[in-house]
Design a protein with these regions (language model features):
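A conserved amphipathic terminal alpha-helix motif
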Residues: 106-141
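Hydrophobic ligand-binding cavity/cleft-lining segments
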Residues: 1-42
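Hydrophobic-ligand binding "helix-grip"
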Residues: 54-100, 106-111, 136, 140
């Protein structure tokens, strides 16, 4: 398994951040790491919803929401032969108007180990960019 994580403090309440984070279909509007998101069932974030995500330098991937605590966190997973990817998005309140965002990404499976090594730097850069982009989007609303 190859795993990556980043955290950032955002000067906004959890609910304000969640409104942007949970609007997956519009991520391409605020982060350069997402080119497009195709909603495969309903646009609102809920368990078992599926999204096709296109990212620069990467193959398109279909993601399924597998864990959800509204206004707090969600996990989605993408599976292909030999590889299983898991991404977590976690919000933790740190004060009256500050929230910590933590993003994690893990590659599992025999192919996931190899892909994780090859794309490790890209993955790390992408989750850091996503965290910084979300912070900028929310704080500049």
């Amino acid at each position: 398994m190859s795993a990556y994580s980043t955290s950032i403090a955002i000067n906004a309440d959890q609910e304000t951040i969640w409104k942007v984070l949970s609007d997956v279909a519009h991520w391409h509007e605020w982060t350069p790491t997402v080119s497009s998101v195709e909603v495969l069932n309903t646009p609102e974030l809920k368990l078992n919803n599926r999204y096709k995500v296109v990212q620069p330098k990467l193959q398109p991937a279909e993601w399924t929401v597998t864990f959800l605590t509204p206004s707090s966190n969600f996990t989605w997973e993408s599976k292909s032969p030999g590889m299983h990817m898991v991404a977590e998005h976690i919000l933790n309140p740190k004060g009256e108007n500050q929230t910590e965002l933590t993003l994690t990404f893990a590659f599992h499976g025999w192919l996931g180990k190899l892909i994780g090594r090859v794309y490790g730097k890209t993955t790390e850069a992408y989750i850091q960019t996503e965290a910084q982009s979300l912070k900028k989007r929310v704080e500049n609303q």
